[in-house]
């Protein structure tokens, strides 16, 4: 876990969103399998040796050092800086972390994620039928934010991790709108 979410589920005043740590590690060749708001998942195979495990630990310690030194994004996460140099120019690691943490707090992301699947999407037709309708041109393109009360012809599949949120033939309603949000 990274700082930001207290043990009782309340939000901390300051935080280090896991997405920043994940991006930092990615720039150093460490693969994070899953990133949540304040958690990271690493998978190790049975044949992993101490060198790889210690490499992960070393890079996590390097992140902590660079965070404490408050490096500029240009130096700490070069790939992120390259995506929008004018935005990240002069920005430092702690500023980025607190900015993202503030957005997570404002939008109550952990609570929203916790409740996202309390009510599952409604199955209106089998996936095969939804696919056939797409093949026959009987579907329309709809922006994702306008998907409520419409039957999906395709999966809504964020990647990573590549797990479908909504399957073809399912419909999101007001009860499960949090899936889209």
Model region roles, listed by residue range:
Residues 1-181:
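Non-catalytic terminal extensions of PLP-dependent enzymes
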């Amino acid at each position: 876990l990274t700082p930001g979410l207290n043990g009782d589920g309340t939000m901390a005043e300051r935080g280090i969103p896991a997405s920043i740590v994940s991006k930092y590690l990615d720039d150093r060749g460490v693969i994070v399998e899953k990133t949540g708001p304040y958690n990271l998942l690493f998978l190790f195979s049975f044949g992993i040796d101490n060198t790889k495990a210690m490499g992960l630990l070393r890079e996590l310690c390097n992140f902590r050092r660079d965070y404490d030194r408050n490096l500029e994004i240009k130096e700490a996460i070069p790939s992120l800086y390259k995506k929008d140099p004018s935005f990240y120019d002069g920005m430092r690691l702690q500023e980025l972390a607190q900015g993202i943490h503030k957005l997570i707090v404002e939008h109550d992301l952990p609570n929203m994620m916790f409740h996202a699947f309390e009510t599952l999407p409604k199955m209106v037709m089998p996936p095969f039928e939804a696919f056939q309708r797409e093949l026959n041109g009987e579907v329309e393109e709809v922006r994702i934010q306008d998907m409520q009360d419409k039957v999906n012809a395709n999966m809504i599949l964020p990647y990573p991790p590549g797990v479908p949120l909504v399957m073809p033939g399912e419909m999101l309603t007001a009860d499960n709108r949090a899936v889209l949000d």
